[in-house]
Amino acid sequence: MKKAITLLFLSTLPAPVLADECALVIEGNDAMQYNLKEMSVPATCKEVTVTLNHTGKMPVTAMGHNWALSNTADYQAVATAGMSAGADNNYLPKDDPRVLAHTKMIGGGESTSVTFKTDGLAGKDLTFFCSFPGHFAMMKGSFKIG
């Protein structure tokens, strides 16, 4: 009986807590650093939303940050190719399939988000990084699904 009452109570609670596990927040600052070196979501997430908050004060032209995701084997090549893609393309090669997800480039005090599907990404070796020229060596981390 106690179990039935507990289940009944739990069924009246608002949206499942699991939904929050599929939404992540990361910060970038004027010292060219993210506040996280690893991000992860459970395999039950069919979509993930990543929000980037730029906690610095410098403008996007001087200390812009974004959040981009690729396979670890590809991220350096993607970041290097992005330098010639320019600011209009968020310093990412346009329509490049190696870019699995990305936000726009933002400056101090701004925020941006990206939502992407996780189909086929569980268990893969993924890296998130900032594609602003020169940032990817320091502003990077691992991204795990599952």
What is the predicted role of each segment?
Residues 52-57:
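Short amphipathic, basic-aromatic surface patches that mediate peripheral association
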Residues 66-70, 129:
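Beta-strand signatures of extracellular beta-sandwich domains
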Residues 20-29, 73-92, 133-146:
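Extracytoplasmic/periplasmic copper-protein system
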Residues 101-146:
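Extracellular/periplasmic metallocenter environments
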Residues 21-47:
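N-terminal edge beta-strand
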Residues 6-7, 17:
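Cleavable N-terminal signal peptides
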Residues 1-4:
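Positively charged n-region of N-terminal signal peptides that target proteins for export
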